[in-house]
Amino acid sequence: MKIVIKLSPEITIKSRAIRIFFIKILITNIKTILKKNNESASIIRNWDYLEVICNHSKYQKICAMLINIPGIHHLLLIKKHMFRSLQDIYEKIILSLNYEIQLSGKSFCVRVKRCGKHNFTSQEVEHYLGNKLCQNIGNIRVNLTKPEKTIYLEIKDNQLFIIIKRYEGLGGFPIGTQQEMLSLISGGFDSAVASYMLIRRGCKVNYCFFNLGGDMHTVEVCRVIYFLWNKFSSSHKIKFISIDFSEVIKEITAKIKDNQIGVVLKRMMIRSASLVANRYKITALITGEVLGQVSSQTLSNLTLIDSVSDHVIFRPLIAYDKEKIIDLARKIGTEILSKSVPEYCGIISKKSTAKTTKQLIEFEENNFDFTVLNRAVSQSYVIDVQNIPDQIINQHVFQVETKKILDSTDVVLDIRTEIEQEKNPLYLNNIEIKKIPFYNLIDQFSKLDPNKIYLLYCDHGIMSRLQVMYLHRQGFSNVKIYRPPR
């Protein structure tokens, strides 16, 4: 058995030189991610697909990594056979997959893709195999529109590929095939999804964060940033730039009229991000703005916001509805994290005008002391996103006891997602384990026995630490972290 990686269709239509360039970058990205996760595999490059050969026990884990790498359209977990005839194909299917059991009492269809020279067509193979299966397996029927079971095959010359399972990938382009960008991220639904969309298009997306709410704001936003990096772009080193905007906010609220604050604040952010982008030779910015979503995002106001920068500003969500954005956030996994991030910009600018003018904005900004803005940018700090847990989250969270050796009275709360719990179950001898995904923990923790000590468990300890922080803020002290000894 092996994994076949099908390239994004947009890669396959490139010229030969560009196609080879993109594939080489994709292979490098795959190898980097496998190495980071202490996995090894052989990658064989073909013209229109890649083959991954690895230990049989690692297939599921490696597939889970590959489906989140930009540039991969889908994965096929396949068995490969040589064949001589259609009867040979039929026997290979029945012998290798026990379809007598899988198809019994169900509707099915056969789908075949074929390339090479043969004396039969793809449709003839489908028809032949369908007939043979119906003749030899009782109580089954063909359904070409909504089958309960679909048998996928690919034929290349005299090779037969039986597709055991198909996994959908991200599509798009491999990271590194496009230029670097700087995302103005607030941690909310919009900026997180906008960042993901440009990552998917092959951009190395760095993050610029304007801290409006202190340490807790930083921690909440860093959860989102680290999640995006860890899931979709850990093949690259990504910068996190944090700018303390508290003094800028004070200056704006003291000097700018209420109805102009929204646009002026956004202009100050774009100015600051442009200075940061110049420092790191980044040519484009990303925002999560949506046309007409709030008063500062009307066409006339966006034009005024753009005018303070020479950089291209990408707004991939410009025509999206909020419902569609949240659906995409849910799909990529940022929805739950973004829910906990307050919208500080909206709190600061509640009465923004929907249509201001250049003259009015410039008149208001004449009252603003730009040394405050320049000082904020000059005092910004930069770290590698992969160091966020150690350099930001752990430093801003009070010390919490971490246990490696458990007592028989301890109760472990497995706070991983249900999918993670199923893929890699936690087994502990004589220890009570409760499965409560982190997104349900806040609501369910108050229902637990307050006289017991609970230890939170996740794969890397990051989510456990964050959840302990939230629980302590709500007054719960009977909670610690469980990190099993390596």
UniProtKB/Swiss-Prot annotation:
Pathway(s) served: Cofactor biosynthesis; thiamine diphosphate biosynthesis
GO cellular component: cytosol
One BP annotation, GO: thiazole biosynthetic process
Chief subcellular location: cytoplasm
Localization, UniProt: Cytoplasm
Residue stretches making up the Rhodanese domain: 406-484
PROSITE patterns the UniProt entry points to: RHODANESE_3, THUMP
Disulfide feature: 345-458
Enzyme Commission number(s) of this protein: 2.8.1.4
Swiss-Prot/TrEMBL catalytic activity: [ThiI sulfur-carrier protein]-S-sulfanyl-L-cysteine + a uridine in tRNA + 2 reduced [2Fe-2S]-[ferredoxin] + ATP + H(+) = [ThiI sulfur-carrier protein]-L-cysteine + a 4-thiouridine in tRNA + 2 oxidized [2Fe-2S]-[ferredoxin] + AMP + diphosphate; [ThiS sulfur-carrier protein]-C-terminal Gly-Gly-AMP + S-sulfanyl-L-cysteinyl-[cysteine desulfurase] + AH2 = [ThiS sulfur-carrier protein]-C-terminal-Gly-aminoethanethioate + L-cysteinyl-[cysteine desulfurase] + A + AMP + 2 H(+)
Protein name: tRNA sulfurtransferase
UniProt xrefs under CDD domains: PPase_ThiI, RHOD, THUMP_ThiI
InterPro entries, per the entry: Rhodanese-like_dom, Rhodanese-like_dom_sf, Rossmann-like_a/b/a_fold, ThiI_AANH, ThiI_fer, ThiI_N, THII_Thiazole_biosynth_dom, THUMP_dom
Function description: Catalyzes the ATP-dependent transfer of a sulfur to tRNA to produce 4-thiouridine in position 8 of tRNAs, which functions as a near-UV photosensor. Also catalyzes the transfer of sulfur to the sulfur carrier protein ThiS, forming ThiS-thiocarboxylate. This is a step in the synthesis of thiazole, in the thiamine biosynthesis pathway. The sulfur is donated as persulfide by IscS.
Sample GO molecular function, one term: CCA tRNA nucleotidyltransferase activity
Domain THUMP: 60-166
Originating species: Blochmanniella pennsylvanica (strain BPEN)
The keyword Signal appears for this protein: no
Keywords for this protein: ATP-binding, Cytoplasm, Disulfide bond, Nucleotide-binding, Redox-active center, RNA-binding, Thiamine biosynthesis, Transferase, tRNA-binding
Family: Belongs to the ThiI family.
Keyword Nucleotide-binding: yes
Active site: 458
Annotated ATP binding sites: 184-185, 266, 288, 297
